[in-house]
Amino acid sequence: MKLKNVIILLVASLSFGSCKTDTFADYVDAENEAVDKYFKDINAVIVHEKPETVSGEWLDSNKRKIFYRTSSGLYYHQVSLGDTTAAKPKVSATVYFRYLAKDLKDQKIYSAMEENSPNPVKLFLTGSSSDLYGEGFQESLMYLNKGGKCEAVVSFKIGNKYNSSLEGGYTSKDLKYLPMLYDIRLVNVE
């Protein structure tokens, strides 16, 4: 009987010992690969200086989307400029916005667009990653003008604070380390 228990414990310990535990570096590497693949798949151009302000979408001469990579690691693409005469969002402003959150494979995670929500989302900008809408998401809002639209790729390191997925079937652990693609429209700034 004792030999049987020893064998069971030995098999169990070998099973647990063979379980892979992902490190933070593993998540960073996986994210970098996913982001690189996403931009390659959509044939986007990445720049490190903010493009000159234009009224429409940031596109290069070959009609490829231009994404501005900020120092924080946010990838920001202007879809439309919006009202340049209106107040610009900044830390301590209250903003109203609509957004769609997706993974980099275009799987919807959450939507606060008109068809899903009667009112825009209201947020007091803190600039902090402690908020549900992390630092990268808030940074995206601060680049927008009232009525403007953008696409933003936000690293898990500067953004994703979702605890659960309303759509897409992700677990909270999956979401914690998932780079997100946001379509954002700024409705108003107070």
Regions found by a protein language model. Name each.
Residues 1-19:
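Sec-dependent bacterial lipoprotein signal peptides
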Residues 19-190:
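Cross-family detector of peptidyl-prolyl cis-trans isomerase
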